[in-house]
Amino acid sequence: MFTSLYNKLHRQLEYMQTFHASMGHVEILVNSDKRFLEGGPSIGKKREELVKRAEGKYLCFLDDDEDIADNYLETLVRLCHRDADVVTFRSFAKLKGYWCLIDMGLHYPNDQANPNYTVRRSPWHVCPVRSYFAKLYSFSDINYGEDWLYFEQVLKHCTTEAKTESIIHSYQHGDHSEADKIVQSEQGTRSNSKVLR
């Protein structure tokens, strides 16, 4: 799934450079270290390394269990030109076998996911945020929940947002992401250790 996402980003970047070069520079950084289950660093360490490498005015993350709309990059760049602290948008999320619409906003509560109505949530690490604020904090050296622990701190500095009502992103919770495989592995290890006792 990552290769498909990476290719989409590069196609959108080529389009931007060809038709909207005046909108500025976009940097796509990838951490290709081994996965944690193969002896590589934690997801938190990988994210931290990317934050340190980032040189742009804004930064955000995309993971291997996410997808983007064809206008994702252009939409975000246009919103970043509004010079707000964070950029927010709408996203589809597949959780526990159902899809729901997530509407992210700076002053929104974190509603529980529900397939029957639009779920309002605070901005997540997938939302572009001022790099200055992002670099004030570090990701924890963990594999699950590192994104919210980090972004919750960063959001304390955000007072303005640039928002689109467009759905430009999707997240599909499942067994294929690195974090999900790590959690499954840890649960399996705990189950096996109980059986062996």
Where are these regions (language model features)?
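Short, well-formed alpha-helical segments that are part of the catalytic scaffolds
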Residues: M1-H20
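Glycine-rich, basic loop-to-helix element that forms the pyrophosphate-binding segment
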Residues: L37-A54
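Short aromatic/hydrophobic "clamp" motif used to bind/position activated sugar donors
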Residues: L59
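Acidic donor-binding/catalytic loop of UDP-sugar-dependent glycosyltransferases
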Residues: E66-L79
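Short beta-strand-to-loop element that shapes/binds the nucleotide-sugar donor at the catalytic cleft/hinge
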Residues: V87-L101
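A recurrent flexible, glycine/aromatic-enriched loop bordering the glycosyltransferase active site
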Residues: K94, P109-V129
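Acidic donor-binding loop at a coil-to-helix junction in glycosyltransferase catalytic cores
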Residues: Y144-Y150
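Active-site donor/metal-binding and catalytic loop motifs
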Residues: T164-L196
